[in-house]
């Protein structure tokens, strides 16, 4: 029981690390900004709930998106015809957490992204070429507080967090495109390194101990991006006249919800935790604050999320593999407007991954 009582502060260590380019996996562009993977795994040395300490976390995330969906319907013909878009995205996430006492903590994190996007339609439609982007992403700074004193509360706890996402990532990353003649221009929104907006992060994390080994967890996350568009040209207006409203990149909100359970095998100086749950993440059609003009691919992914964590003294290893069970590319604002104008339902498509691979390590300094 004591082990789980102290578990609550360790959750704060992991809240902002192990992406997420969280994340909806593919052209629904949730970047690796870290906040989309909240920790549900314990660390053996869990005194961070009650003392001043520092934690360093490093994580890695990879996925390949290639399955196209329009709404919830998969466009299987894209792979048969060989005109699907294929994204390979890797994110290395580094961050540091300062625990002030059993209530308060603050985390600063910065991802590094490596992206490749292979397509036909962006390169004239006859030959497949690739575009690239790599560099630092958007920084986040979040302050968290547990609502109840961990010294007195043993059954469970709730943590609330508030912070900012800073536009440190390049939102106008460029690569060479091959049409009539090669030209350098901005890469697709899904592999841009940042979105150009200053985001407002709000999150709620909680856990409940059912027994000394079995517990449940939940995480709710929303990032509001008040900025409307960021000025990065998409060139979508060159595809069809009906996409004229999408010539500029939108700065969209992002959301995440998780619910699951943990079971811990406790050793003398170590602990192995097995976790399982569901994960919902995506981009809304309309932002919570401000306008929602420009180009975005709204949608969501519902995933089954198995996880493992191994704790040994002052170090914790973790890994999870969210597996998509439902993918939905919802109607964008432009789709809705064109549906009204034409009298027929218009909806774009987006490429999604089958799963993502996430793993990392945390150290108490």
Label for each model-derived stretch:
Residues 28-30, 62-91, 190:
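Surface-exposed strand-loop-strand hairpins of Gram-negative outer-membrane beta-barrel proteins
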Residues 115-250:
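Outer-membrane pore/translocation modules
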Residues 45-46, 58-60, 94-98, 108, ...:
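Residues on the lipid-exposed face of transmembrane beta-strands in outer-membrane beta-barrel proteins
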Residues 25-28, 44-53, 65-67, 103, ...:
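Short loop/turn motifs that connect adjacent beta-strands in outer-membrane beta-barrel proteins
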Residues 60-66, 110-116, 147, 164-170, ...:
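Transmembrane beta-strands of outer-membrane beta-barrel pores
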Residues 1-27:
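Bacterial Sec-dependent N-terminal signal peptides
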Residues 52, 88-92, 133-139, 156, ...:
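Residues that define the transmembrane beta-barrel architecture of outer-membrane proteins
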Residues 69-78, 228-365:
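Outer membrane beta-barrel transmembrane domains
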């Amino acid at each position: 029981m004591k082990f789980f009582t102290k578990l609550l502060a360790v959750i704060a260590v992991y809240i902002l690390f192990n992406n997420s380019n969280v994340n909806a996996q593919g052209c629904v562009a949730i970047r690796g900004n870290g906040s989309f993977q909240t920790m549900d795994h314990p660390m053996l040395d869990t005194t961070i709930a009650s003392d001043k300490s520092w934690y360093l976390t490093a994580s890695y995330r990879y996925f390949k998106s290639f399955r196209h969906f329009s709404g919830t319907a998969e466009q299987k013909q894209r792979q048969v015809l060989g005109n699907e878009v294929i994204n390979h995205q890797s994110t290395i996430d580094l961050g540091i957490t300062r625990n002030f006492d059993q209530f308060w903590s603050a985390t600063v994190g910065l991802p590094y992204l490596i992206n490749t996007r292979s397509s036909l339609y962006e390169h004239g439609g006859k030959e497949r070429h690739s575009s690239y982007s790599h560099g630092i992403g958007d920084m986040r700074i979040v302050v968290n507080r547990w609502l109840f004193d961990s010294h007195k509360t043993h059954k469970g706890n709730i943590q609330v967090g508030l912070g900012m996402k800073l536009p440190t990532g390049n939102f106008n990353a460029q690569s060479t495109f091959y049409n009539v003649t090669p030209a350098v221009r901005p890469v697709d929104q899904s592999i841009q390194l940042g979105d150009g907006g200053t985001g407002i992060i709000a999150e709620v994390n909680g856990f409940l101990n059912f027994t000394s080994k079995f517990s449940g967890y939940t995480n709710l996350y929303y990032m509001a991006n008040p900025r409307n568009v960021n000025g990065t040209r998409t060139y979508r207006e060159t595809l069809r006249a009906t996409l004229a409203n999408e010539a500029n990149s939108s700065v969209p909100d992002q959301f995440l919800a998780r619910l699951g359970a943990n079971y811990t095998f406790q050793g003398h100086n170590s602990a192995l935790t097995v976790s399982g749950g569901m994960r919902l993440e995506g981009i809304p059609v309309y932002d919570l604050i401000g306008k929602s003009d420009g180009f975005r691919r709204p949608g969501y992914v519902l995933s089954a999320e198995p996880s493992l964590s191994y704790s040994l003294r002052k170090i914790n290893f973790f890994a999870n593999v969210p597996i998509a069970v439902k993918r939905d590319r919802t109607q964008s604002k432009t789709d809705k407007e064109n549906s009204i104008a034409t009298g027929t339902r218009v909806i774009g498509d987006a490429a999604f991954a089958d799963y993502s691979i996430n793993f990392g390590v945390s150290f108490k300094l």
